[in-house]
Swiss-Prot record:
GO terms for biological process: NAD metabolic process; NADP biosynthetic process. The lineage of its organism: Bacteria, Bacillati, Mycoplasmatota, Mycoplasmoidales, Mycoplasmoidaceae. Belongs to the NAD kinase family. It is found in: Cytoplasm. It catalyses: NAD(+) + ATP = ADP + NADP(+) + H(+). This is NAD kinase. Its cofactor is a divalent metal cation. It is an enzyme of class 2 (transferase). The keyword Oxidoreductase does not apply. Keywords: ATP-binding, Cytoplasm, Kinase, NAD, NADP, Nucleotide-binding, Transferase. InterPro entries: ATP-NAD_kinase_N (IPR017438), ATP-NAD_kinase_PpnK-typ_C (IPR017437), NAD/diacylglycerol_kinase_sf (IPR016064), NADK (IPR002504). One of its GO terms (molecular function) is metal ion binding.
Length: 259
C-alpha cells in the first residue's frame, strides 16, 4: 500500500509518528498517488490538512495526538501489530462538506464559515432563493454537521449527531430593536438546501465584514458580494465511527463534567 503522512509539530506527536512509521514498514511512503493519508494531530490540524489535501478516493485516517479527537479514530496506543489488519478491514465513507462559492473562488469547509463585523453591517440571508432575513449583529456562522462540536457549539448552536447531514446557521449577538428583530435561534436546514449571503459594498472598507473559512481569513474585496453554500460529498473517504454510543462517549469526555 502507498501512503502519505501529515503530522503536526507538537512534541507529543513525534513519538506517535515514529511508532506509525514502524507499523507501516511494509508499506511505501510516497508524495503522490497514495491510497492512505494519515493525519497525526488534534482536530485543528486535521481540519487544516483536509482543506489542502482533499484527494480523490484516498482513505483518510486520523490519529489523535491533541486534546479533542472528534475527527480521529485512533490514538498512539492503537498502533500495534494488529493495526494494519484492523485498518484494512474498516469501512471508509465519503462525508458531506460545505462548499463555499464566491465570484472568483470555490472551496470546502469542514467546520464552519464565520462572518464577523464590528459595525453590525447588514447581511441578507437567502434560503433556496427565498429571502430569509436581513441580519445585523456581530456575525454569522454556517457549517455542516461536522462543525457542530467546534465553534458552533461555543456559539450555542445545536450539537448534531452522526448520520444527520444538515446545514446550520447561527447568529452571533444579533442587534435587536423594535424595527430589527431576527430569529435569534440556530437554524437547521436539509442537506439539499442552498444558502446565500448577500452583502453590499461598504461606504468605508473597514466597515466591510471579515470572512474566515475553518479559521483561515478570506481575501474578499469591499464590493457587492454574494456567497453561496451547499453540502457536497468529499472526494476523500474517511473512517470515523458513526455509532451513537461512540459519539456520546466523545461528547461526555470532552464537554460534560458531573460529580
Amino acid at each position: 500500500m502507498k501512503y502519505k503522512i501529515f503530522a503536526s509539530t507538537t512534541p507529543q506527536t513525534e513519538p506517535v509518528l515514529n511508532k506509525l512509521r514502524a507499523v507501516l514498514k511494509t508499506w511505501q511512503a510516497v508524495e503522490n498517488g497514495y491510497e492512505y493519508v494519515f493525519v497525526l494531530g488534534g482536530d485543528g490540524f486535521f481540519v487544516s490538512t483536509l482543506a489542502n489535501y482533499n484527494c480523490d478516493s484516498c482513505k483518510v485516517v486520523g490519529i489523535n495526538t491533541g486534546h479533542i479527537g472528534f475527527y480521529t479514530s485512533f490514538n498512539g496506543d492503537d498502533l500495534d501489530e494488529n493495526f494494519i489488519s484492523k485498518l484494512t478491514s474498516f469501512e471508509f465513507k465519503k462525508i458531506n462538506l460545505l462548499e463555499v462559492k464566491t465570484k472568483n473562488h470555490s472551496f470546502l469547509v469542514l467546520n464552519e464559515l464565520a462572518v464577523y463585523t464590528n459595525t453590525a453591517y447588514p447581511i441578507n440571508i437567502f434560503i433556496d432563493d427565498n429571502h430569509w432575513e436581513s441580519y445585523r449583529g456581530s456575525g454569522l456562522l454556517i457549517g455542516p454537521r461536522t462543525g457542530s462540536t467546534a465553534l458552533a457549539k461555543s456559539a450555542k448552536g445545536a450539537v448534531i449527531f452522526p448520520n444527520v447531514d444538515v446545514v446550520q446557521i447561527i447568529e452571533l449577538n444579533p442587534l435587536l430593536h423594535p424595527n430589527q428583530i431576527t430569529i435569534q435561534s440556530p437554524i437547521i436546514l436539509p442537506m439539499q438546501t442552498k444558502v446565500e449571503f448577500r452583502i453590499k459594498k461598504a461606504f468605508k472598507a473597514e466597515q466591510f465584514p471579515n470572512f474566515y473559512a475553518d479559521g483561515i481569513k478570506l481575501d474578499l474585496k469591499n464590493e457587492d458580494t454574494s456567497i453561496s453554500f451547499q453540502l457536497v460529498l468529499s472526494r476523500s473517504m474517511f473512517h470515523a465511527s458513526l455509532k451513537t454510543k461512540d459519539f456520546i462517549d466523545k461528547l461526555k469526555s470532552t464537554f460534560i463534567k458531573q460529580s
